[in-house]
C-alpha cells in the first residue's frame, strides 16, 4: 500500500491543508493500492507562492545551468526506472513491457529532448539595431491526464524547466504515483526550492483554484475537451496563456497498393495500444472498397492474436481500462454502435472470457460504419475500431477530415507521391507515414477541437516563454 498523503511544496514534503485523501485503485484487480492527499485551495496558494517567489531567480539562470539541471534529472530518472515501471503498471494497469518500452521511455525522451534542444535554441535575436528576447513566462500550472502518467507530465516539466519557468503540477488523481516519483527525483538532484511543486487532489479542489490563481501566468492542460474548455474559461478572467492538448478521433487511411498484412498489423496496434486509451489512436480505419474483404480477413487474424490479461504476466499486450466509469463508457459506445446499425465484426460488449475481475474490455471491430455514427465521431478511449470504406482518394480525405478533431492522422501504402498528398491533406497536427513514429523533438498538438499550442522539443519550450522586443538596443 502506497501512502503519498503529503504534498511537495517549496522543496519539502509537507502535510496537506486538507485531511481528506483519495484512494488509488489498481484497475486489473479493482483493489485499493494506495492513497494521496485530496488537496485544496490553501495547498494551491502555498505552492503558487513558492513558485512565484523563485520565479525571477530561476528565470535568470543561464542556459547551461538549466541544461545541467535537466542532465541530472535524466540520470536520476534512469536510476529510478524499475520504480517508475512498477508504479505505472500498478496504477494504470499497463502491461509491464508497455510500462517499460513506452511509458518509462517516453518520459525519459522528453527530458533528453528538452536538454538537447537548448544546445541551439536562441533566446535572443538581433534585428538591426533592435533586440528580440524570449523570457520565461512565469508561474505555470500543469494539469496532466491518467493515460500517460510519465509522458504527459515529463514533456510539460522538461519544457518549463528548459524555459526557466517554475511550475505547480496537478497530476491525475487516478494515476498519481509516477508524479510522486518524479518529485522524489527532482528533490534528489536539487531542483531549486519552489521551481517544482506537486499538489495532489481532484479538479474541484486543486485544478480550479490553480486555473484561477492570479499569480499563475500560464496553464498547460492535457485531457478532455469539456475540461479544457472550463480551464480556458477560468484562465480568461486574467488573460492567462493557455496550452491545451485535447481529444482526437484520428483517421488511418489504408491505400490500395498496401501490403495488407502490414496494414492490418499497423492499424491493430494503433487501436489496442495502451488499451485504446490514447488521444492519437487511429480508431477510424479507412479502407478502399476493392481490398476490403482481404483486409478484414487479415485484420481479424491480427485481433485474434492480441492477448488481453494480467498486466504482470509475460505475453500480455493489453491491460484493463483505467476505471469502472471508463469501462462503462466504452461499453456504452459499443452498444451505441450496434444500435446505430454498425456491423459487429469482432469482439463486442462485456469482458474477455476468464477476466471477470478487473476492468478488462474486449478489443472490438465495427465494419460498415458510416462516418456520421456516434462511434465514428466521438472519442471512445477504449480498444474499439471503426472500419469505413471509400471509393477513391478524394473521398478518403473528405471522410478523414469530417470530424471536429484534428490531433493526428495516419496513412500507409507504397506510392510516395500518394502518401505525401494524403499526409498534406489530413487536417491534423501530426501525421505519420508508414508507421514512422513521432520523435520527441517534433511539435505535437492539434487542429480544431484537439487543442491549442504545441508541445515537445523546442516548440514545447516556446509555450513557456514570452517575447519582448527592445528597440534601439544596439544604437
From Swiss-Prot:
GO terms for molecular function: aldehyde dehydrogenase (NAD+) activity. It catalyses: an aldehyde + NAD(+) + H2O = a carboxylate + NADH + 2 H(+). InterPro entries: Ald_DH/histidinol_DH (IPR016161), Ald_DH_C (IPR016163), Ald_DH_CS_CYS (IPR016160), Ald_DH_CS_GLU (IPR029510), Ald_DH_N (IPR016162), Aldehyde_DH_dom (IPR015590), Aldehyde_DH_NAD(P) (IPR012394). Belongs to the aldehyde dehydrogenase family. Signal peptide: none annotated. NAD(+) binds at residues 146-147, 223-224, 246, 379. This is Putative aldehyde dehydrogenase. The lineage of its organism: Bacteria, Bacillati, Bacillota, Bacilli, Bacillales. The active site is at residues 245, 279. The keyword Oxidoreductase applies. GO terms for biological process: aldehyde metabolic process. It is an enzyme of class 1 (oxidoreductase). Its EC number is 1.2.1.3. Disulfide bonds: none annotated. Keywords: NAD, Oxidoreductase. The keyword NAD applies.
Amino acid at each position: 500500500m502506497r501512502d503519498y498523503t503529503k504534498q511537495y511544496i517549496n522543496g519539502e514534503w509537507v502535510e496537506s491543508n486538507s485531511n481528506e485523501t483519495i484512494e488509488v485503485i489498481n484497475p486489473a484487480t479493482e483493489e485499493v493500492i494506495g492513497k494521496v492527499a485530496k488537496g485544496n485551495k490553501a495547498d494551491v496558494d502555498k505552492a503558487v507562492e513558492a513558485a512565484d517567489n523563485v520565479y525571477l531567480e530561476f528565470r535568470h539562470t543561464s542556459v547551461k545551468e538549466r541544461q545541467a539541471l535537466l542532465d541530472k534529472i535524466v540520470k536520476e530518472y534512469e536510476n529510478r526506472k524499475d520504480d517508475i515501471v512498477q508504479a505505472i503498471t500498478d496504477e494504470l494497469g499497463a502491461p509491464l513491457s508497455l510500462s517499460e518500452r513506452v511509458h518509462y521511455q517516453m518520459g525519459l525522451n522528453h527530458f533528453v529532448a528538452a536538454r538537447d534542444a537548448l544546445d541551439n535554441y536562441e533566446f535572443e535575436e538581433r534585428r538591426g539595431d533592435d533586440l528580440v528576447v524570449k523570457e520565461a513566462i512565469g508561474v505555470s500550472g500543469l494539469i496532466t491526464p491518467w493515460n500517460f502518467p510519465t509522458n504527459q507530465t515529463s514533456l510539460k516539466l522538461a519544457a518549463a524547466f528548459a524555459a526557466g519557468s517554475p511550475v505547480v503540477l496537478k497530476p491525475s488523481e487516478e494515476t498519481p504515483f509516477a508524479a510522486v516519483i518524479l518529485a522524489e527525483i527532482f528533490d534528489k538532484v536539487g531542483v531549486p526550492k519552489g521551481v517544482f511543486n506537486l499538489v495532489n487532489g481532484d479538479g474541484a479542489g486543486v485544478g480550479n483554484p490553480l486555473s484561477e490563481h492570479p499569480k499563475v501566468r500560464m496553464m498547460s492542460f492535457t485531457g478532455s475537451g469539456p475540461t479544457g474548455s472550463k480551464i480556458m474559461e477560468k484562465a480568461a478572467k486574467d488573460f492567462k496563456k493557455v496550452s491545451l492538448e485535447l481529444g482526437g478521433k484520428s483517421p488511418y487511411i489504408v491505400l490500395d497498393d498496401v501490403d495488407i498484412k502490414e496494414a492490418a498489423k499497423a492499424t491493430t496496434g494503433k487501436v489496442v495500444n495502451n488499451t485504446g486509451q490514447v488521444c492519437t489512436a487511429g480508431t477510424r480505419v479507412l479502407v478502399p472498397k476493392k481490398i476490403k474483404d482481404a483486409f478484414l480477413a487479415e485484420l481479424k487474424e491480427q485481433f485474434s492474436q492480441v492477448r488481453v490479461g494480467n498486466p504482470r504476466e509475460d505475453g500480455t499486450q493489453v491491460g484493463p481500462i483505467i476505471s469502472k466509469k471508463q469501462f462503462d463508457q466504452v461499453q456504452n459506445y459499443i452498444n451505441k454502435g450496434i444500435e446505430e446499425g454498425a456491423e459487429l465484426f469482432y469482439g463486442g460488449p462485456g469482458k474477455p472470457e476468464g477476466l471477470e475481475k478487473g476492468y478488462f474490455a474486449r478489443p472490438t471491430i465495427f465494419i460498415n460504419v458510416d462516418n456520421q455514427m456516434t462511434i465514428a465521431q466521438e472519442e471512445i478511449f477504449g480498444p474499439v475500431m471503426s472500419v469505413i470504406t471509400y471509393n477513391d482518394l478524394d473521398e478518403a480525405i473528405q471522410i478523414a477530415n469530417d470530424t471536429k478533431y484534428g490531433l493526428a492522422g495516419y496513412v500507409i501504402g507504397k506510392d510516395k507521391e500518394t502518401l505525401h498528398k494524403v499526409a498534406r491533406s489530413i487536417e491534423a497536427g501530426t501525421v505519420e507515414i508508414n508507421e514512422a513514429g513521432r520523435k520527441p523533438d517534433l511539435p505535437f498538438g492539434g487542429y480544431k477541437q484537439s487543442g491549442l499550442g504545441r508541445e515537445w522539443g523546442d516548440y514545447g519550450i516556446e509555450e513557456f516563454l514570452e517575447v519582448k522586443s527592445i528597440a534601439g538596443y544596439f544604437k
